[in-house]
Amino acid sequence: MAHENVWYSHPRKFGKGSRQCRISGSHSGLIRKYGLNIDRQSFREKANDIGFYKYR
C-alpha cells in the first residue's frame, strides 16, 4: 500500500477532525452553537453581518 493511499484514509465521522469552519476551513476554536460552525476569529469578523450585536 503506497503512502498516497494511506494518507487521510481514516474516516472522520465524529470528533474535532470531522468539523471545520465554513469560512476559513480551520478545525480549531469552532463555535457550533445555533449551527454556526464558524471558528472564533471568523466569528469576530462576521458577527455584525450575521446579526449578533454588542449591547454595551
UniProtKB/Swiss-Prot annotation:
This is Small ribosomal subunit protein uS14. GO terms for biological process: cytoplasmic translation. Keywords: Ribonucleoprotein, Ribosomal protein. It comes from the Eukaryota. InterPro entries: Ribosomal_uS14 (IPR001209), RIbosomal_uS14_euk_arc (IPR039744), Ribosomal_uS14_sf (IPR043140). Belongs to the universal ribosomal protein uS14 family. GO terms for molecular function: structural constituent of ribosome; zinc ion binding. GO terms for cellular component: cytosolic small ribosomal subunit. It comes from Kluyveromyces lactis (strain ATCC 8585 / CBS 2359 / DSM 70799 / NBRC 1267 / NRRL Y-1140 / WM37) (Yeast). It holds the Pfam family Ribosomal_S14. The keyword Ribosomal protein applies.
